Amino acid sequence: MRFVGNRVVLIGAGDVGVAYAYALVNQGIADELCIIDIDEKKLEGNVMDLSHGVVWAGKRTKVRKGTYSDCEDAAMVVICAGAAQKPGETRLQLVDKNVNIMHTIVDEVMANGFDGLFLVATNPVDILTYAVWKFSGLDHSRVIGSGTVLDTARFRYMLGELYDVSPKSIHAYIIGEHGDTELPVLSSATIAGVSMRKMLEKDPELEPRLEKIFEDTRDAAYRIIDAKGSTSYGIGMGLARITRAILNNQDVALPVSAYLEGQYGEEDIYIGTPAIIDRSGIHRVVELEISDREMSRFKHSAQTLRAIKDEIFPVGE
């Protein structure tokens, strides 16, 4: 890889892209943010608005309208562009529309000499991250999807509300597809250092309460989309967290969409799992110790993604 500084190129300034840009600028994560969008007038307004807010941020981030030529020396290209999820529409139903959009974007990025990392947020994110990897020709460690970073945040937040403890003291992951087949990993989860597995053994009535929390986690996007049209702030902050881990070389475990090479008995798919993130991208995938029931649910999630992936990228082609 070759790049200078911490320039981030954001492609797509819709609700998610702008929320990410705001989080990035507000937290002072990048040196420079170049934004590309097909709506030039709205983009100009967003760039002005964000630039004025830099005065009160902790770090001076240069925000400007970008072009694909800015990708040449960028550390990261973050893709938030694509058709939006409509009320009642699953993430996987978006796939046909958005794969073609990814192909066009990635071709432009790579044609301009990009040699950094891709971070993909467009849904269905696991499938589209695989598509970006295929279209780019980069090593899979350099193509990352937002995965279950938002689902995990939602799950930890709701557990924190139940137990009246900070979500930062909760270590519990949502893994699998960022979508309807995702699953919680309770067998290795802890709350303030206390094993959730042991809590379940002591209190069998806890299981249905936790299942309800998981269902609320899984279905949160549908409720938010129905209420306000899109999800934006949570995923924007999740993307900013991944970006900070990369640019600051943090070697931190985050639940992202990562390429599997035998972990969990699966390979050649992108799927949500904890992974160690540093300046090089995905340093390694963390294979959690999960129960037989959790493994069965994970396999179902992987098979769901694989079926869609194989339709787009047939095996052997």
UniProtKB/Swiss-Prot annotation:
It catalyses: (S)-lactate + NAD(+) = pyruvate + NADH + H(+). It is an enzyme of class 1 (oxidoreductase). It is found in: Cytoplasm. Signal peptide: none annotated. Allosterically activated by fructose 1,6-bisphosphate (FBP). Substrate binds at Q85, R91, N123, P124, V125, D126, D151, T152, A153, R154, T231. Pathway: Fermentation; pyruvate fermentation to lactate; (S)-lactate from pyruvate: step 1/1. NAD(+) binds at V16, D37, K42, Y68, G82, A83, T104, A121, T122, N123, S146. GO terms for cellular component: cytoplasm. InterPro entries: L-lactate/malate_DH (IPR001557), L-lactate_DH (IPR011304), L-lactate_DH_AS (IPR018177), Lactate/malate_DH_C (IPR022383), Lactate/malate_DH_N (IPR001236), Lactate_DH/Glyco_Ohase_4_C (IPR015955), NAD(P)-bd_dom_sf (IPR036291). GO terms for biological process: glycolytic process; lactate metabolic process. Keywords: Allosteric enzyme, Cytoplasm, NAD, Oxidoreductase, Phosphoprotein. The active site is at H178. GO terms for molecular function: L-lactate dehydrogenase activity. Catalyzes the conversion of lactate to pyruvate. Homotetramer. Belongs to the LDH/MDH superfamily. LDH family. This is L-lactate dehydrogenase. It comes from Corynebacterium efficiens (strain DSM 44549 / YS-314 / AJ 12310 / JCM 11189 / NBRC 100395).
